[in-house]
Amino acid sequence: MTEVVMFRGSMVAMVTPMKAQDGIRDAVDEKALKQLVEYHVEQGSDAIVAVGTTGESATLDYEEHRDVIRATVEAAAGRIPVIGGTGANSTWEAIELTRSAMEAGCDAALLVVPYYNKPTQEGLVQHFSAIAEAVPIPQILYNVPGRTGCDMLPETVERLADLPNVVGLKEAQGTVERAEEVIRRCGDRLDVFAGDDFNALGMMRVGGKGVISVSANVVPRQMHDLCAAALAGDMQTAEAINERLTPLHQAMFCEPNPVPVKWAVEELGMAGSGMRLPMTRLTEAGQARVRQAMQDAGLL
């Protein structure tokens, strides 16, 4: 692991490149993955999240999770922090994935709220407490109720903030007000990161420490600069960058993530857009919208 403990700025939720085959069991393209890591090191991303939602964690098996995280850590070679996506809707599985990420050399783990089985708030406390107690690695919790069907409330986050290994929250509930309440309750016990590019600046205005970014897959330098300016209090510069990138942020979700961003990465010639079913290639209408947003951002 690197010596970086505190996470700040633009942390790219990196795509997982795949070799287009039958769309059912397309192989991970490890060569392209390592090239992407190099790109993010060169372009100034502040950290890499491997095998998160954008990295198609839902369609990778356990061994593939481990292999993608290992390859990312190897390519990073201590030059940039690596955060491994290790969440699961089984506490035991999440512990095993998190332990594997720690052993691979990750600097932290990103743990999504358990999905589909819809635990109670007490269930969430016990779930994340068990992981924190079992694996001594910094852990960032991830609340994204639009995908999981379960919203981790601010009072629950407040209870978890005292756990020694819980260092942050990726908040993707969708409103700045939610992040502001978590920050008010938790203070400096826990850092809050935006889970959506479109409200990253708003969250940093109220005390957020950065963003786990989809757009940074294609505009890593710009997202780094936006966060650096905001965290330094230079809101004029941050607002100018944000205004220029807003159409791109919106286009990245014109169809379910990571469909648009994988197509955008392919358009830039960095990796193919192959992905596993049930995710399908970006539609022609989506391609037109993303292409226009990329042109507006000066990428094409």
Curated annotation (Swiss-Prot):
GO terms for molecular function: 4-hydroxy-tetrahydrodipicolinate synthase activity. Keywords: Amino-acid biosynthesis, Cytoplasm, Diaminopimelate biosynthesis, Lyase, Lysine biosynthesis, Schiff base. Pathway: Amino-acid biosynthesis; L-lysine biosynthesis via DAP pathway; (S)-tetrahydrodipicolinate from L-aspartate: step 3/4. Its main location: cytoplasm. The record marks T53, Y116 as: Part of a proton relay during catalysis. It catalyses: L-aspartate 4-semialdehyde + pyruvate = (2S,4S)-4-hydroxy-2,3,4,5-tetrahydrodipicolinate + H2O + H(+). GO terms for biological process: diaminopimelate biosynthetic process; lysine biosynthetic process via diaminopimelate. Gene3D superfamilies: Aldolase class I. Transmembrane segments: none annotated. Pyruvate binds at T54, I212. It is found in: Cytoplasm. Its EC number is 4.3.3.7. Catalyzes the condensation of (S)-aspartate-beta-semialdehyde [(S)-ASA] and pyruvate to 4-hydroxy-tetrahydrodipicolinate (HTPA). NCBIfam families: dapA (TIGR00674). This is 4-hydroxy-tetrahydrodipicolinate synthase. It comes from Halorhodospira halophila (strain DSM 244 / SL1).
